[in-house]
Amino acid sequence: MAEFQGYLELDRSWKPDLLYPLIFREYIYAFAHDHGLNRSNLLENVGYNNKSSLLIVKRLISRMYQQNHFISSANDSNQNQLFGYNKNLYSQMISEGFAVIVEIPFSLRLVSCLKGTEIVKYYNLRSIHSIFPFLEDKFSHLNYVSDVLIPYPIHLEILVQTLRYWVKDASSLHLLRFFLHDYYNWNSFIIPNKYISIFSKSNPRLFLFLYNSHVFEYESILLFLRNQSSHLRLTSSGGFFERIYFYGKIKHPVEEVFANDFPTSLWFFEDFFMHYVRYQGKSILTSKDTPLFMNKWRYYLVLLWQCHFSVWSQPGRMYINQLCKHSLSFLGYLSNMQINLSVVRSQMLENSFLMDNAMKKIDTLVPISPLIGSLAKMRFCNVLGHPVSKSTWADSSDFDIIDRFAYICRNLFHYYSGSSKKNSLYRVKYILRLSCIKTLARKHKSTVRTFLKRLGSKLLEEFFTEEEEVLSLIFPRTYSALRSSYKGRIWYLDIFCINDLVNHK
C-alpha cells in the first residue's frame, strides 16, 4: 500500500472518492503485472512478450478514451467484441487493474485503523495454526457445534450492492457490472459453477476481493449481534432489523417466522455464549447452551441469507451435533472430543470416598483417506494408496525430482505437526518416497530393485528429514525438554496459506 500511496500523492487529479480515473493510469497496470497475477495468460498466451507490455498498456488506454468500445449488446453476446480482436487480452488487463484499484478504499481504511498500533503483535494470528490452540482452549467447555458453509450469492447484483457501501464512485460500480456481464450471462439469475471456476482462474484477485467483501458483509452483521448482545432486551425486533439494513425486505418474515421468538424484546440472545471460527467458505458455530439456542441461530442465519443476500439455503443442511459424539473436519484436520475418566480418592476426616473426574480434551487427527485421495489426484499413487511413478517429472534432473518430493513431504509433516497420532503421516511419507524412487527408476529405464541396489537406500534420507530432527537442529539445547513436555504436538505460526505447502517454488 505504501507504493500506491506514493503514486496517489503525485497524482493530484485523483480524489479519494473517485476511483474511475485511476483506470487510465499506466502505473496501475504495472502494479497488477508486478504482482504476478495471470502473467502467462496476460502476455504469453496471446503472442506478446514482456518488452512490448508498455505499448499494450498505452494502446489500451488510448482505446478506452473511445467510449463507443464500451457499448455492448446484452441481447447478442457474439456482437459484444470488447476492443476488437484483442477482447480477451484487454478485458483481462482492465479487470486486473480494476482489482488493484477497488482495493484502495479498503487499504486506506485499514492503514488508518492500524496507525499507532503494534502490528507485529498480531502477526502470529495470521497463521492457520493459530486457530487450533483457540479450539483446544475453548471447545473443551462447549457442548454443541454446527458446520456452516457460507453460500455464495446467486445474483451478481448482490456483490455490486455490497460494494456500494464502501465504494462511492458510481462509475466504478458500473465498470464492475460490465466485467461481470462480460464473464457471465447477465440475463441468467443463477451462476453455473463452471462460470465461477472460469472467473476465479482468469482473475483470482478480483474474484477473491468480491468474495471477501461478501463474507465481510455477512460477518459484520454477526459482529454487530455479538457486540450488542447485552442490549438486545431493550430493542424491539423492528428497530433491531432496521439497524442492519434489511428491515424492508424481511418485514413480513419477521412477523411470521419470529412471532413466537421475538414478542417485544429479543430474549433469544440471553446468556450469549457463542464462538465463531471461519476459514475461506467454511465456518463453525459452537455454544455451551441448549440445542434450542443453536436451532434458533440456525433459522436466523437462513433468514439472513435469504432476505439480505437473496441466497436460498435450507435449515436442514446445517447440522447441529454434540461435540462429544461428533468429529469435526476443519482445515485438513479431524478433531473430536475425548473424555478421559480418572478416579480420585478423597478423604475428609475419617471418611474416604472415590470421585470420578472427567477431563475433556480436543484430539486432532490426520484424515488418511482424504490425503490419499489428494495424492491419487496428483498421480503419486492410485486410489488404493499404492505408489506410482510421476511421469510428468521424469524429464527433470535427479536432484530436482528428489527436491520436489522432499518439499511436499516436509511441508505435510510441518502442517500436520499438531496431530496427536502421526501413523497416517508415515504412510504418506512411504507413498511419496516410493513414488520418488519409481520416478527416478523410470527416468533411468530401470526397475526399482535394480535402482536401489545400485545407488543404495540411503539416497533419499537427507531429503526426507523428519520434523523432530529439524527441531533438534534448530533448538539443540531446549528440544529434549520441549519434546518431553509437549509430546510432539507443535502448532506453527508461520503457515499463512495451505496452497504454499504443495506449490514448489
From Swiss-Prot:
Q: Biological process (GO) annotations? A: mRNA processing; RNA splicing; tRNA processing
Query: Which locations, inside or outside the cell, does it occupy?
Result: Plastid, Chloroplast
This protein's UniProt keywords: Chloroplast, mRNA processing, Plastid, RNA-binding, tRNA processing
Which residues pair up as cystines? none
* GO MF assignments: RNA binding
Q: Which domain of life is it from?
A: Eukaryota
For this UniProt entry, what's an example GO CC term? chloroplast
What does this chain do? Answer: Usually encoded in the trnK tRNA gene intron. Probably assists in splicing its own and other chloroplast group II introns.
**HAMAP family the UniProt entry points to:** MatK (MF_01390)
Tell me which family the UniProt entry assigns to this protein.
Answer: Belongs to the intron maturase 2 family. MatK subfamily.
Can you say what this protein is called?
A: Maturase K
Organism encoding this protein: Ficus carica
Q: Taxonomically, what lineage is the organism?
A: Eukaryota, Viridiplantae, Streptophyta, Embryophyta, Tracheophyta
